[in-house]
Amino acid sequence: MSPILTNRQAEELHKSIIAYLTANNLLNTANTLRAELNLSENAFDTATAKKYETLLEKKWTSVVRLQKKIMDLESRMSALQTELDNATPISLAKRNKDPASWIPTAPARHALESHRDTINSVAFHPIFSSIASGSDDCTIKIWDWELGELERTIKGHTRAVVDVDFGGPRGGILLASCSSDLSIKLWDPANEYKNIRTLLGHDHSVSAVRFIPLGASGAPSSGNLLVSASRDKSLKIWDVNTGYCVRTLQGHTAWVRDVYPSPDGRFLLSTGDDSTARLWDISVSNPESKVTMFGHDHFNECCALAPSSSYQYLSPLTGLKKPPAASSTAEFMATGSRDKTIKLWDARGTCLMTLVGHDNWIRALAFHPGGKYLFSVSDDRTLRCWDLSQEGKCIKVMRDAHERFITCLRWAPSIFKDTPTGHGAGDGRNGDSKKTEGPDVQIRCVIATGGVDMKLRIFAN
């Protein structure tokens, strides 16, 4: 008898094995085992065989499920232990007071519901407490993120609204949206979000839209130019005043999923289904892809340029003794892919590091305005924080941040007091200023996420 099992447990195991062998037509083996165990035919009749014939398989699958659950719990415990190790009472108190070190924590301040389908994108108003969300339900909704209230619903697109962004000329902030209906629309927040212009020219779904910053000294503000990315494999630059496409960038060989402008408006970072990221210098008359980054094993979903506040943490990875000047843009960047990884790159296209931890597609990235952290969201329903000062170590995992896939992430743009209409540099997806860059810059500790659960979640200090 096994020293681990009781007599009854051993008997059930023996009968289960015999029943399994019999059910799989291994009769000789079953009879031999029955004889070895001295089980008579009366002790193992038809009723007994029926009772035990699936028991072994059920117990086996139960063990496999239990093992997976144990592994998941061990992984979660390890992540929590890491977070605990990095969170002394002193460091927590300091982090909560210092915007440059603030990290979002659960629960969300607001979980806003009104959309009837997946939320694909979110964008903060650069001045007011308004936030826009675009959805597969073909609408854009404007919310007050401080009060957690719906302000209005904007209709106009005939298919899914894929991306939204605030920006525009100085003194005239606009909301831009793009859609699977092949169009880009401009809306005027000062006139009840009236549709003032529709931009047509792409031959397939438009997957991303961003205002291009002017890049003036001090706070970068958006100008008259807008960039869009499309499934037609191209990027287009538009003049929002005239509605004309002033430039088309060709180079990607498949769907372009995302685009991110540099704070000075000189560079664009794009990525997509050809598994590459491309850095474009649009300050020249005939821009071509300046650098092409290869390395991901699946389609790329998102990209982001690192703010200058991150240079001090990323420069050691390149062997530089001193970080590049803060005025130098597009020195470092990040890409997220369906291969479940995030890659960090330098301006030469060298992969500096691969961040592994997500269990599903990476859907959006956001650099902390303070420069120390990189945030990511994924179809694994988590929001993760990677510490760039610790060589990209994952220091926080917010599990079940949404009930289903998380599709978008955005950081509220910093406030530039001397330039109130500033869009916030490549707020692109997330904002990228740092309080220490100047006395007139204030980091807003607010992020928003959206997902397939049709909820817009606001995390704020």
UniProtKB/Swiss-Prot annotation:
Gene Ontology, cellular component aspect: cytoplasm; microtubule; microtubule associated complex; spindle pole; transferase complex
Cell division: present as a keyword of the record?
yes
Q: Does the keyword tRNA-binding apply?
A: no
* PROSITE patterns xrefs: LISH, WD_REPEATS_1, WD_REPEATS_2, WD_REPEATS_REGION
The protein's UniProt keywords, in alphabetical order, are: Cell cycle, Cell division, Coiled coil, Cytoplasm, Cytoskeleton, Microtubule, Mitosis, Repeat, Transport, WD repeat
Residue stretches of each WD repeat: 114-155, 157-197, 201-248, 251-290, 312-355, 357-396, 401-457
The UniProt entry's GO biological process terms, in alphabetical order, are: cell division; establishment of mitotic spindle orientation; microtubule sliding
The record's section on Pfam families has: LisH_PAC1, WD40
> What SMART domains has UniProt attached to this entry?
WD40
Q: Identify a single GO molecular function assigned to this protein.
A: dynein complex binding
Location relative to the cell: Cytoplasm, Cytoskeleton; Cytoplasm, Cytoskeleton, Spindle pole
The SS bond pairs are none
All copies of domain LisH, residue ranges: 9-41
Q: Give the protein's function.
A: Positively regulates the activity of the minus-end directed microtubule motor protein dynein. May enhance dynein-mediated microtubule sliding by targeting dynein to the microtubule plus end. Required for nuclear migration during vegetative growth as well as development. Required for retrograde early endosome (EE) transport from the hyphal tip. Required for localization of dynein to the mitotic spindle poles. Recruits additional proteins to the dynein complex at SPBs.
Per the similarity annotation, which family is this? Belongs to the WD repeat LIS1/nudF family.
Q: What is known of its domains?
A: Dimerization mediated by the LisH domain may be required to activate dynein.
Q: What protein name is recorded for this chain?
A: Nuclear distribution protein PAC1
- What species is this protein from? Arthroderma otae (strain ATCC MYA-4605 / CBS 113480) (Microsporum canis)
